[in-house]
Amino acid sequence: MNDFERFGRNVVRTFYDPPPCNESNEPIWLLGQRYDSRPPLPKPAPSDSSTTATATAQAERNEDESWIRTSIDDKERKEAPNGEDPTQYGNWPSAFLDDFESRVWMTYRSGFSPIQKSQDPKATSAMSFRVRMQNLASPGFTSDAGFGCMIRSGQCILANALQILRLGRDWRWQENHADKDHAEILSLFADDPQAPFSIHRFVEHGAAVCGKYPGEWFGPSAAARCIQDLANKHREAGLKVYVSGDGADVYEDKLKQVAVDEDGLWQPTLILVGTRLGIDKITPVYWEALKASLQIPQSIGIAGGRPSASHYFVGVQGNNFYYLDPHSTRPLLPFHPPSLAAATSDTPNLTASTTSVSSTTSSTTIVPPADSIPAPSDPRQSLYPPSDLSTCHTRRIRRLQIREMDPSMLLAFLVTSEADYQDWKEGVQGVQGKSVVHVQDKEPPPRGQEREGAIDEVESWDEDGLQ
């Protein structure tokens, strides 16, 4: 994209998608954390009326200035991350902005090694018109623009779950402070076939298991299945994944089969619930429960948004949902293995060419040898320069009203212990309106496999016995 095209896109975005301002007094929730929309006014000290009025006015002015300030330290950060103008953030609590910016933001990327197209004649018709046109003369996809937004939203869910699990919920991103653990998490999602949670891995697995052609848009179900299977393959991440299936029912017996190890200990588990809360729009009876899903401490967010345009929702205020938008194309995030030891201890198939074929799709991903990627000279240093890390964070808030959201979505929760699970269970069940997650003790048997002998317990009635 040249400068003129970039300027034109920014102009259009300014008029049609202006940065939202905080105009509500309702509290703001972000993945279980509450932020007051307005700072409490200081109590005036007893004094004469003229002095009190002057002091109060000055205090309110100072509060307003500190409340809309977006930098951590004016001397260390002259502008918001990614070159964005701090003046666009109107009246938002700075603590909320810091938290929002600390969430991992995955977007479209370009310039990565090609993802080969499927040779199936049906593959072209499965792509959108935009994807077909922009890849017409190319044998593979070097960008996921136009089809990868649900994959990127799924990466957001998985990356933020790992970040909270490893760094804690209170960890905050600082542009000028390198964090090795944070960089190692991002390296898992690098745009390279060697990265276990890369766009290449998602597309490859979607073709092999979910019936999704390379270049075809994923739905919530396919994204959840890929997250689960890729996490199972990369056990070093230390995260189990449970997927509810086709509905909003979470079966406790099946969940514990995933979450509880052989010693009876609960392992950190990501619960993914794919659901549909209406036909064209979200039915109002679900509104309060959907808001509550972002207010409980176990929340990892929601992947969904508009039809064929997924977003990653992390916050809510009243009927407004705040999200990170993947529809912004950036250069690829390169892959840097955490260390030479880690690079050589990966599974063997990461250092060779891999091919996946299913009955409906086929794709080939060429994986370069692990030793062709340089490892950092000092394993204690960050794997990435700040310029790379900053592409995975933003303070740019986007907002969507609940009545405008698509009803099909993927809800995500992280439970780390048995007690945490019980708290989550109470949280999703004790909501106003109709619940968006249903917890059942056991999965019912498939139709036709009901309990033997049940038919003998049914009383028979003849016509004479009817009253």
Curated annotation (Swiss-Prot):
A single cellular component GO annotation: cytoplasm
Region Disordered, residue ranges: 32-93, 343-390, 429-467
Organism: Phaeosphaeria nodorum (strain SN15 / ATCC MYA-4574 / FGSC 10173)
Keyword field: Autophagy, Cytoplasm, Hydrolase, Nucleus, Protease, Protein transport, Thiol protease, Transport
A single BP term in Gene Ontology: autophagosome assembly
Polar residues biased stretches: 343-352
Stretches with biased composition (Acidic residues): 455-467
PANTHER family for this protein: CYSTEINE PROTEASE, CYSTEINE PROTEASE ATG4
Active site: 149 (nucleophile), 325, 327
Name by which UniProt lists this protein: Probable cysteine protease ATG4
UniProt function note: Cysteine protease that plays a key role in cytoplasm to vacuole transport (Cvt) and autophagy by mediating both proteolytic activation and delipidation of ATG8. Required for selective autophagic degradation of the nucleus (nucleophagy) as well as for mitophagy which contributes to regulate mitochondrial quantity and quality by eliminating the mitochondria to a basal level to fulfill cellular energy requirements and preventing excess ROS production. The protease activity is required for proteolytic activation of ATG8: cleaves the C-terminal amino acid of ATG8 to reveal a C-terminal glycine.
